[in-house]
From Swiss-Prot:
The protein, known as: Sec-independent protein translocase protein TatA
GO biological process, one term: protein transport by the Tat complex
The keyword Membrane belongs to this UniProt entry's keyword annotation: yes
MF term (GO), any: protein transmembrane transporter activity
Subcellular location(s) of the protein: Cell inner membrane
Length: 67
């Protein structure tokens, strides 16, 4: 069950009263940087996995050829 627009406004007001505008802005920017870093690492990971798989195949081929 999703809260309606009135409930969301009440929650927003309570959060602003508890944390204040400046601290809430800092938390938002920190969260944005964390999400940006996560997306960046997710884009780099598949390339790393491909290189690792190529290295494993190359290592197996080298090991078999030395027998």
């Amino acid at each position: 069950m999703m809260p309606g627009p009135f409930e969301l406004i009440v929650i927003l007001v309570i959060v602003l009263l508890l944390f204040g505008g400046k601290r809430l802005k800092n938390v938002g920017s920190d969260l944005g940087n964390a999400i940006k870093g996560f997306k960046k690492s997710m884009q780099k990971e598949p390339a790393d996995q491909i290189n690792t798989k190529d290295n494993i195949v190359e290592a197996k081929t080298t090991k078999e050829s030395t027998k």
